[in-house]
Amino acid sequence: MSDVRIPGVGAGKYDNLIQSLMKKERIPRDNAAAKVKVYEVQNNALKDVERYARDLRDAVKGLYSFNNPFAEKEAHSSNERAFTVDATRDAAEQNHTLRVKDIAQGDAFLSDPLPEDFRVPSGTYTFCIGEKKICVSWKGGHYRDFIRAVNKQGKDSLTLSEIKTSGASRALLFRSELTGKSSRLSFEDAALDLALRLRVVQEARSDVFTQDVLSVGPGKHARLDFPHPLRAQAGLTLEFVASLEGASIANEESRAHTPAQGGAPTSSHGNTASAAHNQDGAAAVRPTEPANGAPVQEETSSVFFEGVTVKNEASQGDLPTTDGLEKYPAVDDKGDNPRAPGESQGTATHEGSGSSTDNADDTRSTGALAGSGKLALESLQGHALPLPPLVLTQNAPQMVSIPLREYGDVRALILDNAQARGALTLRAIRVRAEDAPGGYVPVNPASQAQDAAFDFDGVHVTRGTNSITDLIPGVTLSLHERTEKTETLSVTPDVNAMKNAIIEFVAKYNRLMAEINIVTSNKSAIIDELAYLTPEEKKKETEQLGSLHGDSTLLMLKDRLRRNTSNAYRAGDDGASRTLAHIGISTKAHASSGINTAQLRGYLEIDEEKLHSSLNAQKDQVRALFGHDSDGDLLVDNGVAFTLTELLNPYLGRSGIFAIRSNGVDERIKSTEKRVETYDKQLEKKERELRHKYHTMDGALRSLQKQSDAIQNFNQSVRNRN
């Protein structure tokens, strides 16, 4: 009995036997699980093909839909530092000239230095920006707390900041964030008291400087020094009445009205112009009427040129009188004008020489004068800043207005008479300040509110903002700085947008073709040819390689894609048929020797140079090649992009071919997974049964072993007694 043994049964040996038996039982289950993985790979492959097909459909549909790139426009600026242009697809193709003279800006006023412990008293502080009012109820406190309170209330309209003007000095800067003349910054209530206290503003004075007359003879020039430098930021305007007169009359008036330094003009005939002194002590001469006694009247028309407004005087039908001419002496034989007493030390100085004898003869013979004069402003550095030349005729005075802010800081006016037959005379010269809001002007303006001013196709235009959307339909013009000369802006078709859209179409097409090639073939070289794949994408594509090998649906789709991209289509009004190869797109766009296996797989190539030239020369034909209306019903019904869209539509969507195929695979996956679950339950039950049987067998063997041992012990004891 002790020799009775069952192979594989004993101390744990039955486990190996059970596993061996269960391994054979698991074969059907493992086969079903392997099918699930195959189905999952196939389903992922179908979904990838569907995704790339949808990307291609979206790309080609965009080539003929209402937002197709062939209607896109791009705007060009010849000086992007000075101005930039943005155009929408609604803008028309056009070209314009532009010269920026002023940039719209807002007021920015700087205060005098204030101490570190400066406190702002309590009160209602009202800041006005145009018609907008910003009220701050202040209980009093340190100026930095006041800054925070103003900025919180001002938001995007008013900014108050602290400026360190030096290491130990600080000042307040009041800045308006709104631009344009209509958005001037002013102060009311307690804000006005604070502005006056800190010398942010002061009471305005209308005329900064006045002068009766300045006259220069033929071939000579004169200089008029201002009592103090005129700052560009002060918003000043120089005005005068210019006229061309006979040489003898002008020479006498030049002598009579030349002012002495620091005083009023003197006259050899006792005609002294009255003078008033401003607060700075500089002489301010009140304008007088012209020599013939006729007052300067409002102009009937004007011309604006390079920042200067030239205004015509009112027309007069009467012949000029000779009253008062007898007081002017005749020109001497040498043509030299007698110098008025004190002229060499006066504010207005005359230089140069020229003969006027012939000129007087010309005047007597023709009875009329016509000519031009050169004007210039002198900068603080001594540079001459030319003004547009004056073109005048005799007895036709013109009023001229020059905004000084366009010329920077200046200190003098220079007059050069290039006319050889008459004298150039400026009367009623004055420098005035612009209308000040509330009767106050800034003391230290960092900038002053002004409109943007520019010449657009020769027409003077102003706007209160630098972003102009209402000048050209569909175009936004953004001004950045002044231009030194006339620049150009243009709106043209956006060829790059068209080309990029076509390149995107080709890329999406090739990606779909590559995916079909990968899943329907088991050649790893297909993946190796795709250099644009990332390592992760290559790993994924390797898993899907050949997963749908020989799939007739995908092979048919591939064939139809190739045929649609190689077919000819009628494109354009000329009725000519064109293919993608005509614009540089084909399976062999670049000439090469030998056979390229990649070209045999149906991938498209692009000759960018040919495509670019086609878009430039035949944009409408290229557009029609991708999609056009062939029957006049205003609906696109032909073209490469249209036919590809129609081809792909049945494959996509919830009820499309890919969705149906994918749903079928999902059902197989579910049914197979259920079979796997059933196998797992059966195998678990089978393993329990085997373990129960072998445990029972093992118990029986152990019982028999014990009985055998008992018998042996009994026999041994019997033998021992004998």
Curated annotation (Swiss-Prot):
Coiled-coil residues: 660-710
**Location of the region described as Disordered in the Swiss-Prot/TrEMBL record:** 251-299, 311-368
Choose any GO biological process term that the UniProt entry carries and state it: bacterial-type flagellum-dependent cell motility
Location(s), subcellular: Periplasmic flagellum; Periplasm
| InterPro entries recorded | FliD, FliD_C, FliD_N
Q: Which GO terms describe its cellular component?
A: bacterial-type flagellum filament cap; bacterial-type flagellum hook; periplasmic flagellum
| Chief site of localization | periplasm
Family the UniProt entry places it in: Belongs to the FliD family.
Complex and partners:
Homopentamer.
What NCBIfam families does its record include?
Answer: PRK06664.1
- What is the documented function of this protein? Required for the morphogenesis and for the elongation of the flagellar filament by facilitating polymerization of the flagellin monomers at the tip of growing filament. Forms a capping structure, which prevents flagellin subunits (transported through the central channel of the flagellum) from leaking out without polymerization at the distal end.
What is the protein name for this chain? Flagellar hook-associated protein 2
Provide the gene name from the record: fliD
